[in-house]
Amino acid sequence: MSAKEVKFGVDARDRMLRGVDILANAVKVTLGPKGRNVVLDKSFGAPRITKDGVTVAKDIELDDKFENMGAQMVREVASKSADAAGDGTTTATVLAQAIVREGAKAVAAGMNPMDLKRGIDLAVEAVVADLVKNSKKVTSNDEIAQVGTISANGDAEIGKFLADAMKKVGNEGVITVEEAKSLETELDVVEGMQFDRGYISPYFVTNADKMRVEFDDAYILINEKKLSNLNELLPLLEAVVQTGKPLVIVAEDVEGEALATLVVNRLRGGLKVAAVKAPGFGDRRKAMLQDIAILTGGQAISEDLGIKMENVTLQMLGRAKKVMIDKENTTIVNGAGKKADIEARVAQIKAQIEETTSDYDREKLQERLAKLAGGVAVIRVGGATEVEVKERKDRVDDAMHATRAAVEEGIVPGGGVALLRASEQLKGLKTKNDDQKTGVEIVRRALSAPARQIAINAGEDGSVIVGKVLEKEQYAFGFDSQSGEYGDLVKKGIIDPTKVVRTAIQNAASVAALLITTEAMIAELPKKGGAGAGGMPPGGGMGGMDF
């Protein structure tokens, strides 16, 4: 085990504070509509330009181990806010820095760190209660667009795209963000259920121009196993032919004489039929087939349930108004499933999302939920250069999470005003002793930091702006740093999701309180130079190659 260096008390906190300041100062320049960009060097490819706080925070690694510990703790604030609300990472970092700075002063003045922490916790509870009380539900499409615009740093086009996407796929739908191949940003919405499996044979194609199968009012056979034996299928095929309706077969695979017969009948006999492979693998495949069955009002044919293929009747098949199958995807629109059954399945998947600890599983469950409950919208972000597209994509990601958060918990005035108003509620807060009162005061002073920083980034005097905003009683009154005017921020469309502001203060206070109560820090001693260099002479490994 290598030797360790230990720092105590003021020395430890000073080093840690330096790290906190370095990270927070790099992140906070991005705050607000007039925030600046940060350029990140990449070991390969072009540098990355971003205005996303958490992306900047994740890129910072300091040489000094003790400073780095402070920086990493504040990075955790940004990451946690990004995970919980998807936005508000810069606000959380600015708040954490303000609380740590004020707290360190109080500890240096001889106050009890544990009582300070209790005071901070009390204050945060009161702030959260005030935010929830003043939160306003999002009702219109315009409000969703405003939230998206603010989060995308005033880009109204992004706000509009997100509002359209939310309108089309609903709150449960999935919105994905991709890089476009052109200059234009575009929105592509897939309604109904789509899965990434295409037709097994191109001979099933009905629309030769688009090379896809298009069926209206189709029956859907959902089978877990491979279909290779024709005799199993015959009774069902005969029943479907009599109805005159098309049949889509979703199975693990269709091969051998079963596939050959389907193709021949499709080409010669005019049997409207198409076969696709089942989506997913293993247990996930079973679940997805069950989803398709519930959506279409059919039954997933499985030998586990004791249903044999030759005994399948028309009543066991699913129905859909429209089915489209191309080389890579199958889309089922307007399935005939009962609304109550679909809602029960949605509730079940939501419960699984709550319980799962795996990010991968959560993502897959959310995809399944979207396919059942809403649809999938893809925003393709365009730009002139790769660097611009990546920067814009970061902003679209932020805005997408912010709009989701706004729909979940409502909105409050933006521009740091909601936190400023909450700070006024802390003046009369009851505490058990003076040190706890100081803890409350630390949070009260820190709550003005985001509004100050937004003003500073816009070239204004932060203290003057904060003073003027607090003079007015009106809750939504604040400073619009984009236009340089005061007014009702909600009417101006400057709004923040309550969830984003709430998670920012909770995460900032949580980590900051831990930093304040730190008394010792332990890190590995830096390695002595030369020992691990392998004895190579200076000037490169090969003689005579010094150009």
From Swiss-Prot:
Q: Which reaction does it catalyse?
A: ATP + H2O + a folded polypeptide = ADP + phosphate + an unfolded polypeptide
What's the EC number here? 5.6.1.7
Q: Recall the GO molecular function terms of this protein's record.
A: ATP binding; ATP-dependent protein folding chaperone; isomerase activity; unfolded protein binding
> Which keywords are on file for this protein?
ATP-binding, Chaperone, Cytoplasm, Isomerase, Nucleotide-binding
The record's section on InterPro entries has:
Chaperonin_Cpn60_CS (IPR018370), Cpn60/GroEL (IPR001844), Cpn60/GroEL/TCP-1 (IPR002423), GroEL-like_apical_dom_sf (IPR027409), GROEL-like_equatorial_sf (IPR027413), TCP-1-like_intermed_sf (IPR027410)
- Where is the protein localized? Cytoplasm
Membrane-spanning segments: none
The UniProt entry's GO biological process terms, in alphabetical order, are: protein refolding
Class of this enzyme = isomerase
Specify the signal sequence span. none
Main localisation: cytoplasm
Q: Which PROSITE patterns does the protein's record reference? A: CHAPERONINS_CPN60
Q: Name one Pfam family in it.
A: Cpn60_TCP1
Q: Which GO cellular component terms are attached? A: cytoplasm
Does Metal-binding count among this protein's keywords?
A: no
**Residues annotated to bind ATP:** T30, L31, G32, P33, K51, D87, G88, T89, T90, T91, G415, D496
Q: State whether it acts alone or in a complex, and with which partners, per the record.
A: Forms a cylinder of 14 subunits composed of two heptameric rings stacked back-to-back. Interacts with the co-chaperonin GroES.
Q: What does this protein do?
A: Together with its co-chaperonin GroES, plays an essential role in assisting protein folding. The GroEL-GroES system forms a nano-cage that allows encapsulation of the non-native substrate proteins and provides a physical environment optimized to promote and accelerate protein folding.
Q: Which family does it belong to?
A: Belongs to the chaperonin (HSP60) family.
* Protein name stated in the entry: Chaperonin GroEL 2
Question: What is the native source organism of this protein?
Answer: Rhodopseudomonas palustris (strain ATCC BAA-98 / CGA009)
